[in-house]
Amino acid sequence: MEDHGYAYSVLEKLSFNRVAGTEDEKKAAQLLLSEIEQAGGKGELMEFPIPASTVTQEGMRIVSPYAREVETIGYGRSGSLPEGGKTLKFYYAERGVAEDYVGMDDLSDTAVMVNSISYEAYRLLCEKHAAAFIVMRGFHYDTLETANAYRKNLGDEKIRLGRIPGFMISAKDATEMVRDGVETVHLTLVQNEFEATSRNVLAVIPGTEYPEESIALTAHYDSVPV
């Protein structure tokens, strides 16, 4: 088999979700280790802990001026709302920059929707004590499915600023909510945080001409929600 054919066959074997810290990631690591050994090489798995979470409840419902369920995906590691959820005011802050919050200092009773959740946008949400944040995904005509949405985790750099329960919705729903003047929403988010185990696959190929020298090659084999 030619090299490109072999490479493609390995990709086919790895064609499944391999989120870091899950059994599927472990399965992918063992598959790669097996390929290394079948090729006559030696490898090992190097385990290390990573923060993880499991969302057990998530939901969004428009309360006023009309009632409607909105499909949503909760942000991992963003914290939880009280059991049963919480009804909050809804505010669209567009880019989430200072100019979008003129005259607004305390948003502890408000779910704030922004176009994207940059570090600066999140910092301002923390500064304003927002009760929750909502981010849109895709184009104005997209559903979560057509936007290829998947659960993301709140990054460490944002968590250091504080935890705000986060939600992802489709740009289509976001557009309709702004257009129709949504005033209040009921949000539900419950999740458990824990320490999971991830792993690197290490293999060494001894050099032939300069065995005392080393070249390090690295690549991700896991699917990382970011």
Q: Regions from the language model: what does each represent?
A:
Residues K27, S116-I117, I169:
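Short beta->alpha linker loops
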